[in-house]
């Protein structure tokens, strides 16, 4: 059996530290340029260096996305960026995730000691393509999202055994082929292939065919329109044995725009599912209700297995709404205690003294607790923490640890903007 890597996203230094603590084997991040998540917080070079050092201290690898489809004017900047990564101290990133052949060759020239992984944006759909990238010096290829497990297993059997295969196993699905979308360009002038996607696939649409009056296309809709591009979220937590059988090395979680609560929950759950299965398939099956309960505790759009078991049916789409299911509200991350035994936090959503909340721990435990006190930075007691990103100190009826996450159960649906 090949060694399994759990690869998780991080939008910021704070989230990187969380996913490292909550079970990731590797983390993928974006710098301030040349990745495909321009709206994410992303990392400055200083933050990236600190994040790489933190991850390496915990035995976790870090991959940096540079997967834009480059234009002529990008190439000099790419070279400068890779030179900075090459010179990063005390540690460099472990790999670059690249889609464009020109960007790949610049990386090979400027920072040959950093591994090169080929992004799903490169539309990697056959074993000849994988071998092509291997011959050019790639150590890993990310599968196109449109591949079935059968096809991935066939690829595994035809390529060099040293080459690694990475596959998205959980998260939001793009409606376009391997993420190469022009809807955002067309409607808003913002280039999805340069990291500026406005997600028009989630908008509300009504279909009109002006040249065919009286002829109605068979689309599903409600009174607000139709959601013909609105895919369910991918979830393979119930199919770990099939992922292993296909020969996949790295199980990738989508979500560089997600909160620390989301990525921590998903990382912790997949970590336990993988470890349970490797310890005992029977234990994995017995714990399946817990995995599903935890996965559904964070925001999601309903689940699908995507293309893994063949061409998706109409059941893969959501036609009647554009809402997330929301199980919990993210309140914040527990920091270090002060001399009075109160724990430092930065507010992510409002909560109040007397509320019952939940302490989410990296080991899988969820501990109910009551908020006993809230104190601002000047030592003044507060009844609540109403201000976004407000720094304060909290006392709970149960003792938390640094990097625990506080959350509040909601169980509601929230509309997407």
Give the predicted meaning of each segment.
Residues 102-103:
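Alpha-helix capping/helix-boundary segments
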Residues 38-53:
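Glycine-rich, positively charged N-terminal anion/phosphate-binding segment
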Residues 111:
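Conserved phosphotransfer cores of two-component systems
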């Amino acid at each position: 059996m090949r060694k399994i890597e759990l690869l998780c996203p991080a939008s910021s230094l704070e989230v990187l530290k969380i996913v490292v603590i909550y079970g990731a084997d590797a983390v993928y991040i974006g710098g301030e340029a040349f990745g495909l998540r321009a709206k994410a917080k992303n990392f400055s070079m200083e933050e990236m260096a600190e994040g790489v050092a933190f991850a390496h201290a915990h035995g976790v690898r870090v991959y940096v996305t540079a997967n834009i489809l480059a234009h002529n004017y990008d190439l000099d900047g790419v070279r400068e960026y890779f030179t900075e990564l090459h010179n990063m101290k005390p540690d460099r990133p472990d790999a670059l995730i690249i889609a464009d052949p020109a960007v790949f060759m610049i990386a090979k020239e400027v920072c040959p000691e950093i591994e090169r992984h080929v992004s799903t944006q490169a539309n990697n759909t056959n074993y000849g393509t994988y071998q092509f990238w291997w011959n050019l010096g790639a150590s890993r290829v990310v599968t196109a999202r449109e591949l079935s497990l059968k096809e991935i297993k066939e690829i595994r059997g035809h390529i060099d055994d040293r080459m690694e295969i990475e596959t998205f196993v959980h998260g939001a699905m793009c409606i376009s082929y391997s993420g190469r979308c022009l809807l955002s360009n067309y409607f808003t002038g913002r280039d999805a292939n340069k990291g500026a996607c406005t997600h028009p696939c989630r908008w509300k649409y009504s279909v009109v065919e002006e040249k065919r009056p009286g002829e109605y296309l068979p689309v599903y809709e409600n009174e607000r329109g139709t959601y013909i591009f609105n895919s369910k979220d991918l979830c393979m937590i119930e199919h770990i044995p099939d992922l292993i059988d296909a020969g996949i090395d790295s199980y990738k979680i989508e979500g560089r725009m997600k909160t620390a609560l989301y990525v921590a929950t998903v990382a912790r759950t997949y970590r336990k599912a993988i470890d349970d299965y490797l310890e005992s398939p029977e234990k994995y099956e017995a714990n399946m209700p817990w995995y599903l309960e935890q996965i559904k505790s964070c925001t999601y759009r309903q689940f699908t297995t995507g293309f893994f078991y063949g061409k998706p049916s109409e059941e893969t789409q959501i036609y009647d709404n554009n809402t997330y299911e929301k199980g919990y509200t993210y309140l914040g991350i527990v920091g270090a205690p002060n001399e009075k035994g109160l724990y430092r936090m930065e507010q992510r959503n409002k909560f109040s003294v007397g509320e019952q909340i939940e302490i989410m721990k990296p080991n899988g435990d969820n501990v109910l607790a009551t908020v006993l006190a809230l104190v601002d930075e000047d030592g003044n007691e507060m009844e609540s923490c109403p201000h976004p990103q407000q720094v304060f100190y909290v006392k709970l009826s149960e003792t938390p640890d640094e990097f625990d996450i506080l959350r509040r159960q909601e169980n509601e649906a929230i509309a997407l903007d």
